[in-house]
Curated annotation (Swiss-Prot):
GO biological process, one term: translation
Required cofactor names: Mg(2+); Mn(2+)
Protein name per the record: Probable alpha-L-glutamate ligase 1
Domain of life: Bacteria
Coiled-coil segments: none
Organism the protein comes from: Hahella chejuensis (strain KCTC 2396)
Record's cofactor remark: Binds 2 magnesium or manganese ions per subunit.
Amino acid sequence: MKIAILSRNPSLYSTSRLKEAGEKRGHEVHVIDTLRCYMNMATHKPTIHYQGQVLEGFDAIIPRIGASITFYGTAVLRQFEMMGVFPLNESVAISRARDKLRSLQLLSRKGVGMPVTGFAHSPDDIRDLISMVGGAPLVIKLLEGTQGIGVVLAETRKAAESVIEAFMGLKANILVQEFIKEAGGADIRCFVVGDKVVAAMKRQAQPGEFRSNLHRGGQASVIKITPEERSTAVRAARVMGLNVAGVDLLRSNHGPLVMEVNSSPGLEGIETATGKDIAGLIYSFIEKKSQEKKPSTRTKGQG
């Protein structure tokens, strides 16, 4: 198969592993810089140009689209979809997952467990907002934050009021979320491929820190998950419409709670922690889909 990887940096671990794993399985794999693509919206014959050439003949595309280029990245991916190329994750699903508020609303509507969460911009009653999610301690997040940036734990009601007022001064949209103390500063990253959890790792925050992101010094280790955690992760990915996803869960006293569904999960942490060939499992999924008469691209670039 001829496969494209949309990535701005071919030397990143995830990108290089996906290229290596694909070539090892006999595929022709091209890494394409997302922002350097330019598109022709010609009637009935959409095309993509790259380095002066028309990109054609691709069977599948693996999007590795960074959060900062979501708009342009999903536009390029949508163009590939319109050309009949099978996407590992569809553009509409990536856009859905990148919108934190929309993600939470969809998960809520489908009854997927998650922390009690409030959303606000300029609340006229901050005390009521805090009470609405169960009071302090609570977590306050900037809606646009990634990798633990713009996330604050307010231990007291007074601290929560101060943080919310500060964020209001930035004219920012904020999420106010119950703090799951029993999680002990740890979360679980479930790696979902094609309706199956193929690997899971525990991410433990450093002492004195509550954010467990590996980018913030969190430590990863292999973990055995429960059947309920497994089904919750699969359901969350399905709600987003993602074939491949990193679903972050917290263990609470009332079952697994979804924190986030990542449409472009990194491979380094999970492969290192579990020793599993996740890149190879992704290609197994693509190969299986390619043998279907009509690969399940639900939106055909219409999203």
